Amino acid sequence: MIPPCDPIILENNPQFRKLYQHLTTNLLNADGSTRANDEQPARKAVLEELRGCRVRSANKKIKQQILQQLAFDADSGLPDDYRDPLAVITLYLESSPSRLDLEDGDDHRSSHDQALSLLASDIDAFYSIIPALVIPFSNALSSALEDLRAIANAGKSLDCAASAPAIPHTSTLPTRTRIRTSRNQFKAKSQAPLASQLRERLQKLRQIQLAQIPAARARMAITAAKVLETRAEILKHTVVLLERVKHGALSRATKSKAEHLALVAQGVEAKLRIIKLDTAAILYTPEVVTALDRYRQHLRETRERLEEKQGKLLEELKGYESMDSTETHELSARSSKEHFESGPMREIARRYGSLVKEIEAVKLEIQRISG
């Protein structure tokens, strides 16, 4: 088969395009064979001989396959006594030296003769059962022929089966084998020869293989090339965008601006520190520092005096509490308000109460005298 060529290559190379068109249209067929030799009588004779050899080889293979199917298929309808020698013969045909790539010679002939002598009884049994194999062999061929016709007529409407006469299902009818044989004969009469159908089918498939598939592959290759080109463009633009974002003018300007602002912030911080130090130097002069030290010393001494005075007052308070401890049993029956008062306050209240009583007594005495 001539490989397809990229149309871009043909467009970029006009001379090669002329040569390619000349080869594909004038000198070579679509399968790569030479057109000039097709009309020669010698070539036609060789082709006919080759076709005959192929037909004979196909016939042998078909017969061998049918015999093998009858030998190893339990539904073939043959008795076991017939299938055993048939299986031996089919295995011998499948593995015979003539079908293997062995060298010719005396050893080859001797081994072949030995095999024939060993299989003499089986070969005689095979020849004896050949009449019984005719009908199953014919039925198997008819079934294969029907399958081939179905393949050849794929996609077409099958009207032959509808026009076939209906066969009632009764016990007096012939066997299934005879029904299939009659049906196959009717189909063979009503349909075109299978060889022509298969040949036409193969020609169509060959045409598709040589014409449409390469063209589709070429289109697919062109599409794939366009996809790869588009992908390369996308990657290129992606790299450019990344370069602009990371190392472009805008990113560099933003980075420079950020660095400038950072330096400005550091300068402002240094200036604030200098201003703080200058302000501290102006406020805290030696005189102010000395005055603050004296005031701090004064506060310390005042605190010590207050703490000492607090200690003295606490000692005095403890003395009052000890003096009041002897009257605890007498005041146990008083109210809860008097119970929570301190010792010195309770003494003051007691003295005030006695004084009030004396004043009331004096007032009563004055009223009695005046009255």
Swiss-Prot record:
Where are the coiled-coil regions? 287-323
Domain of life, source organism:
Eukaryota
Keyword annotations from UniProtKB, A to Z: Coiled coil
Give the protein name, as stated in the record: Uncharacterized protein AFUA_4G10530
